[in-house]
Amino acid sequence: YKGLYDLDKPFTVGSEKAYILNENPNVIYMTNMHVILYLRDGRVVNILSDKGQYNKETYDCLFEKNVRASDGETKIFAENLDLLATKNIVEIYNNVSLTYPTGSLKADKIDYNFETKYFKVSMFDEQKIKMKVIK
């Protein structure tokens, strides 16, 4: 499948297996889901997970279990990642680990923008994040 993220960024969605339920024909349930985002600056982001859902109408992608994402520099690992084309945001949550050229961090939830490389970090229950910055 092909879709658009943020109205002008193309992406492709694929999987090993997929099925559609009659009661919700716009949602495709996938096994070994793989999305490739093509960013304006030429970078390519690969997002993979053991399970996931793709909405053909909204282009939203929901990844579950063993989520891995990378743009070649930044690497993200988590249990869940929601690529919300309808909101122009990536929500990453549950056991999030993010490594990037100048450091690494662990958190419960990160809202990440692949285009700008900005992220907002939060913890459930007001706990502190664990972050390491390398100069």
Model-derived segments and spans:
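Mature-chain termini and adjacent capping regions
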Residues: 1-135
